Design a protein with these regions (language model features):
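Domain-level signal for soluble alpha/beta catalytic cores
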Residues: 1-178, 182-205
Length: 205
């Protein structure tokens, strides 16, 4: 079984090749982008997408979350319009289940879904959407207790995500686990724990 996402015309296989995900369609720290969202300036947003495709991105992240806008409606509009000007697969990036469903409903292909985690409430919101519309879901190795400090703890959360997904008919090939990387300033062992988590994901899950 291979882990594959697609647009209407192009597939991206997650194997040994590094996959470049363009992250410019995201309001975090971008005042012009935030204003474009407030103004419903799709032309500005689409230009960000085209530029990233031209510069070698394999996948485009789409995050239009801003408290003062209608995120579900904006997600639907941006996903629709982006597909008309680029042929890269998209990663739908939102913490809103409603916005996620609006994007999935109009997406032509099999997207990357960002994200779920080990929290029961989050899995109960997102996995039914993945089962209904299809997609490869990013699973963050954290849960109600936060980010585990050890690789073993993160693997336990990863296993919980995989097992819960299976109950919805979602196979492990449609889950990409994110082992999480803490900054060295906040945890001097952070990088070591992340590398050990990645090794265990490869060898045990």
């Amino acid at each position: 079984h291979r882990t594959v996402i697609s647009s209407y015309s192009q597939a991206v296989v997650f194997d040994k090749k590094t996959i470049i995900i363009g992250e410019r369609i995201n309001p975090t720290g971008k005042s012009k982008f935030k204003q474009a969202l407030r103004d419903h300036n799709l032309e500005y947003i689409l230009r960000e997408g085209v530029t990233q495709q031209d510069n070698g991105a394999d996948v485009l992240d789409v995050n239009v979350g801003l408290p003062e806008i209608d995120e579900p409606s904006m997600m639907e509009d941006v996903v629709k319009e982006l597909q008309a000007v680029i042929d890269l697969p998209l990663q739908l990036d939102t913490s809103s289940a409603e916005a996620m469903e609006r994007g999935l409903r109009v997406y032509n292909g099999k997207p990357l879904i960002n994200s779920v985690n080990g929290k029961k409430e989050v899995m109960e919101q997102i996995f039914p959407l993945v089962a209904k519309y299809g997609g490869v879901v990013v699973g963050l190795c954290l849960d109600e207790d936060g980010i585990p400090e050890t690789a073993e703890g993160r693997i336990a959360v990863g296993k919980k995500i995989i097992d819960t997904a299976a109950a919805y008919g979602i196979g492990p090939e449609d889950i990409i686990l994110d082992g999480l990387c803490m900054t060295v300033s906040s945890d001097s062992q952070g990088a070591i724990v992340t590398l050990e988590t990645l090794r265990k994901i490869r060898d045990e899950l």
